Amino acid sequence: MRPSLVIFDCDGVLVDSEPITNRLLREDLAARGLDLTLERIEEIFVGGTMATVFENARALGADLPDGWVDWFYEQMYAELAKGTPLIEGIEDVLDQLDAAGIPYAVGSNGSLRKMSITLGSHPALHARLKDALYSAHALGVAKPDPELYLKPARDAGIAPEACAVVDDSATGCTAGVRAGMRTMGFAEHNDGARLKAVGAEPFHRMADLPGLLGL
């Protein structure tokens, strides 16, 4: 069944920003006494907010000063501004949604500033999405709270059960499932088991998404 609205996560779904952020985070935490592999960084932190990263890293022994979150944001923004690649195939997905007359939105735990930087590396894509960006920072709620996906649906006047979510983290997929939406778990670099465990339907190539959505 075709959805009436598709809501995408941003990092790791539209733009391949997570490797950049994870590398910066690993380097900084190692310098502050918490040496983790990139795999552990992804397992522990991906899909959350920087505030929860701060809390969890401190609990694990990182010597993080007050004000670290704001400081790290500035480091991250500067690095992302050098250029953030798109997820392969995402533009074709949006083209097919446009051809089918199906609207789409973005729901992210990241800030609007971050999305403007990462998506802004691709002006044509940013122009397609800029009026449908929903940020946890602006809404005051973050995934796994389903509100980050329910709000775009309400604004579009579309029932949750007629929507599809595309997310790459267990946290985000949990939000989609809790929202009562069909949730597609994008597992580009793993088997998708963690996404399936929270109720998502894993898939591994963005090129496969149109077929899964019945386009």
Model feature map: region roles:
Residues 1-4, 91, 95, 111-215:
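Asp-based, Mg2+/Mn2+-dependent phosphohydrolase catalytic module
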Residues 2-10, 14-100, 116:
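N-terminal helical cap/lid subdomain that shapes the substrate entry/recognition surface
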Residues 9, 13, 108, 168:
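Conserved G/P- and acidic residue-centered "switch" motifs that form tight phosphate/ATP-binding loops
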Residues 86, 107, 141:
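Residue-level marker of regulatory loop/turn positions in helix-turn-helix DNA-binding domains and
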